[in-house]
Regions:
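Conserved catalytic core of the tyrosine transesterase superfamily
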Residues: 1-323
Length: 323
């Protein structure tokens, strides 16, 4: 316990997150909210605080900052983790904060023609990634973090590892992307071979694999499908290595393509995933199949796309057209 007290709180948080095998994304989110919580209460140590202070912070987020329900839930999860896993001080009783309202918004969906227009305005690696977002229904993070071993060309499928909810799932590999993807991987392989010759070529391995198999990170199958152009030091181990392409890079490319195409909708990388689901339903695929491809735990989440199909000009005939 003395050693734990000597360490800074955020170091202990990172170590606990690492032991739980949480993603780097979750780590940064939890650190962010724990910092916000401490600063909100004038830098008091969390051990000096409890339910009342958590309620005050979460209510502040809902009322003053007007965060979404999902953002407030993430902040709450971070604090629960802090008290339970780091401080060994589980919270007693309910947290009676004012909860943020979950807005009822329909996702932005492109028509098939609009999707084609935007993709036509993209080329190279970004164009290939956009086609995967739409053609396979990938989340942005799933696309950029994909590894060579996750693509099964023989079965025409992509295995999404540790997706949302820490579950694997399988989605389709479009026939039309097989050759472009194979050609792209040949270029990536040449880059990897150059890195190996320079004494590098190692990528970050998930969970404890790096310790169990020290040399595995240099293997071809573990390399990222869409590697970054530059080497960078790992935030956890400080090792200089090639990471995956930044999400921001692809986001900017999609936004630019949407502007060039003249589509007057708020288009993001997520829009391709929404369009993938909607177009499958339009083509007659059943809701359960779409649910599995998207990786939704609850079919109610997938049902939002049926609401899109049942609303708007294609589903209802305006009375003015009957005059």
């Amino acid at each position: 316990m003395e050693n734990r007290q000597k360490k800074k709180l955020l170091v202990l948080v990172r170590e606990a997150i690492y032991r739980k095998h949480y993603s780097k994304r979750t780590e940064e989110a939890y650190i962010h909210w724990i910092k916000r919580y401490i600063f909100f209460h004038n830098k008091r140590h969390p051990l000096e605080m409890g339910n009342a202070e958590i309620e005050g912070f979460l209510t502040h987020l809902a009322i003053k900052k007007r965060v979404s329900a999902s953002t407030q839930n993430q902040a709450f999860s971070a604090l629960l983790f802090l008290y339970r896993e780091v401080l060994n001080k589980p919270l007693e009783g309910p947290i009676n904060s004012l909860r943020a309202k979950r807005p009822k918004r329909l996702p932005t969906v492109l028509t098939k023609e609009e999707t084609f227009k935007i993709i036509q305005c993209m080329s190279g690696v970004h164009g290939l990634m956009a086609k995967l977002l739409y053609g396979s229904g990938l989340r942005l993070s799933e696309c950029v973090e994909m590894r060579v071993k996750d693509i099964d060309f023989a079965q025409r499928q992509i295995i999404i590892r540790d997706a949302k909810g820490m579950q694997d799932r399988v989605t389709i590999l479009p026939e039309g992307l097989v050759k472009p993807l194979q050609e792209h991987l040949e270029r990536v392989k040449r880059l990897h071979q150059k890195d190996l010759k320079k004494g590098g070529g190692s990528v970050y391995l998930p969970f404890a694999l790096g310790r169990k198999y020290p040399g595995a990170g240099r293997g071809w199958v573990w390399q990222y499908v869409f590697p970054s152009a530059r080497l960078a030091r790992g935030p956890r181990d400080g090792v200089l290595r090639r990471w995956y392409m930044s999400e921001t890079t692809l986001q900017r490319a999609v936004h630019k393509a949407a502007r060039l195409s003249g589509i007057n909708k708020r288009v993001s990388c997520r829009t391709f995933r929404h369009s993938f689901a909607t177009h499958l339903l339009q083509n007659g695929y059943d809701i359960r199949t779409v649910q599995e491809l998207l990786g939704h735990k609850d079919v109610k989440t997938t049902m939002i796309y049926t609401h899109i199909l049942n609303r708007g000009g294609l589903a209802v005939r305006s009375p003015i057209d009957m005059l």
